[in-house]
Amino acid sequence: IRYAQKNMDVVHAVNFQPVSLTGRMGKGEREKYRITVPDCIQRIEEQTNGEVTVDDWFPVPSCMPLTNVIEAFSSKPKYELSIHFACGAGTYIFEDAETKKFVPLTKFCDIQGMLELFEDKAEEIRSGKNKYFTMLEVVRKLKGFVDTKKQPAGLDLAKMFGNILMKRSFESIGSWHVKGLFLGMMHFQDKYNEDLERLQRCDIHYLTPDLRIVPFCAFNVIPEWYRDRIQKKYSITVEEWEQREGVKLEDGLYRGLMRRGAG
């Protein structure tokens, strides 16, 4: 995180993956090596000297009210991060220009109140209220959730959120993202902690050639049922692929490297 702080002109996110334990391990070994999302969050608080606390984090599905109000306003289905609450967490932090200390989003913005507003207004639009007047009301109220005295210099959070809500574009999201540093983590499961409720709410899937949708933590955690069996059934050699497609694999690789600016 400190490395990212020193390079925030090019680094805008740090994502942690608490280790998944594989192979034969006794209970003592598992307890020794096991680290969970709450463990990581606690250690981040300790290692940032309390600049980023455990209270600054939100489970991933907390962003659903924002998705809901944008979906209601646009009348188009949107991608939903509606995964199980235990799958991951995230927060946004900014840097104080004078002290160089981190200022988490929660320190100057009432996120809980803002999310409640989004959910309430999404329901109003769905129930038939004029969506344009409703969204104007949302944008008008955004400033009330931001403590401008604590807000980092050069940041206008209410304006950026308003742009995201009204423009709903990658550019509007990008202008927000480059101003801060996203911290996130997602704990992929293993055979010692596989949770069926988490699998049922998975947001990262594999689509197999036989048109099955398999949750990530089932596909990779139980490979003898899914990954290995599927790959064995459908994999082909490079030579077979080249003959079928009528191209050389190395030619495609070369073109890909050229597009990325390689020599």
Question: Where do the PLM segments sit?
Answer:
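Extended, Lys/Arg-enriched charged tracts that mediate electrostatic binding to polyanionic substrates
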Residues: 67-74
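Radical SAM enzyme core and accessory elements
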Residues: 75-263
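Conserved C-terminal portion of the radical SAM core fold
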Residues: 1-66, 82-91, 96-98, 211
